Regions:
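Charged, alpha-helix-forming regions
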Residues: 1-280
Length: 280
């Protein structure tokens, strides 16, 4: 892909801290490509969940920075609401709406499944807001306290296998499907074949769309036109990788798909080269 085909990335100074280790997430591979059972994973909810995981990892344990010291508050990870909004690129002063987004994130239930176990769980077990000066006060600072379910917290704080993700890229995306696809492909970047897992296209749709799994699918050609192709184009436009779709057909119908991944080091991304190479 030539340099002109890349969408303009924000000036480096705007994201100078974004490419440092303080703005990176070690995301458990178990938390990449999530399939939703209830609710919907939108772009903002995906970004917000990543930001919450990042701050939990940075804090190291619950209870630190609690604005009001109580036994109950020792169970939460605490971070200023302004920091969450900044890191998730939430460009609004509407605190009420941001609280609604956190509630939506808490209400989402996801499916995790392997060869021996199937689990349905929430991404957040609880969240709370606190301001030492009073929630209705115009002064002071609003803090967000949040807690993960036990299985999620273990994956967040002690991931056995993880993928490094920089916020500088997630905050360039305009759709949740693009962010989800980027995370999946970043996970498989070090695969010697540079191919993702080969899966039925419906499983890809579940993971990328953020819609509840198994609750109806469009025709493949519609899913490809409206979801897969725009997401692939955006990943190739703004990130450090180039990807292409490989379709496997059963007769005349597409049954499975896989994505080929190539590392992109164009001049448009020259200041990310060291960051990317360190993870290879």
């Amino acid at each position: 892909m030539d340099k002109s085909s890349k969408r303009a990335i924000a000036p480096f100074d705007d994201y100078a801290q974004g490419v440092s280790e303080s703005r990176e997430l070690r995301k458990s591979n178990e938390a990449i490509g999530l399939r939703v059972r209830k609710g919907k994973l939108t772009l903002l909810s995906r970004k917000m969940f990543n930001v919450l995981m990042h701050h939990a990892q940075k804090l190291g344990s619950p209870g630190r920075n609690a604005p009001v010291v109580t036994e109950a508050n020792k169970k939460y990870f605490w971070v200023p609401l302004a920091d969450l909004a900044r890191d998730a690129a939430y460009e609004s002063n509407d605190t009420k709406r941001l609280k609604e987004y956190l509630q939506e994130l808490k209400d989402i239930r996801i499916i995790s499944e392997d060869n021996v176990q199937w689990t349905s769980q929430s991404l957040l077990s609880a969240f709370t807001l606190a301001n030492p000066n009073g929630l209705k006060s115009r002064g002071g600072q609003i803090w967000v306290g949040f807690a993960f379910p036990p299985e999620v917290e273990a994956a967040v704080m002690r991931p056995d296998q993880y993928t490094n993700l920089a916020f500088v890229y997630q905050n360039q995306f305009r759709s949740g499907a693009s962010l989800a696809l980027y995370e999946i492909c970043r996970r498989f970047l070090t695969n010697p074949s540079q191919l993702t897992a080969r899966l039925p296209w419906t499983e890809w749709f579940d993971s990328v769309s953020g819609n509840p799994a198994g609750q109806g699918y469009p025709e493949y050609k519609i899913a490809k036109r409206d979801t897969f192709k725009p997401a692939i184009a955006e990943v190739n436009s703004v990130t450090d990788i180039n990807i292409e779709l490989i379709e496997h057909k059963l007769g005349r119908r597409v049954s499975e798909r896989v994505v080929r991944i190539d590392l992109n080091l164009t001049w448009g991304n020259f200041y990310f080269i060291r960051l990317v190479r360190r993870f290879r």
